[in-house]
């Protein structure tokens, strides 16, 4: 009897997690197209908000290096802002961040254009910045 319950328990757990992620991502999708925080200092280019945490291994070993490599090839006016959710919990709540890492791409007006939950490669983020209005070098 116990052996029969294990697959059911596993299936219920997986289903519950899938539902949680769907609800979370659905809530964040509502933010696309909205301005939640005015662009800093008259920004002329898109920017990235990078939500991280002290204990987030993937944040430190993969996402941060990908963002640094991306930043090295970007125009100096593109801002990548690293936000520790323990230091700025209100900002994390405003953007409905529930998983780390999360990167949010904003256009020059501060409007949310893309939200990435989990690791986002430099290539993906560069494409999202271009879609948000970053000029492409000729």
Residue ranges of each PLM-predicted region?
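Membrane-interface amphipathic/juxtamembrane segments adjacent to transmembrane helices
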Residues: 30-45
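N-terminal targeting signals for export/organelle localization
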Residues: 1-34
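Thiol-based oxidoreductase modules, predominantly thioredoxin-like and allied folds used
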Residues: 75-89
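Non-catalytic, surface beta->alpha helical segment in thiol-disulfide oxidoreductase systems
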Residues: 105-138
């Amino acid at each position: 009897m116990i052996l029969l319950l294990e697959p059911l328990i596993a299936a219920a757990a997986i289903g519950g997690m899938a539902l949680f992620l769907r609800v979370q991502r659905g809530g964040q999708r509502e933010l696309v197209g909205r301005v939640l925080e005015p662009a800093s200092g008259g920004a002329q280019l898109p920017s990235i908000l990078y939500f991280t945490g002290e204990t987030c291994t993937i944040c430190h070993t993969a996402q941060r290096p990908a963002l640094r490599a991306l930043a090295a090839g970007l125009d100096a006016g593109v801002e990548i802002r690293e936000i520790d959710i323990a230091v700025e919990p209100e900002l994390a709540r405003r953007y409905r961040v529930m998983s780390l890492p999360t990167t949010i791409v904003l256009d020059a007006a501060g409007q949310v254009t893309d939200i990435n939950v989990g690791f986002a490669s430099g290539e993906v983020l560069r494409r999202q910045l271009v879609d948000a209005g970053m000029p492409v070098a000729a």
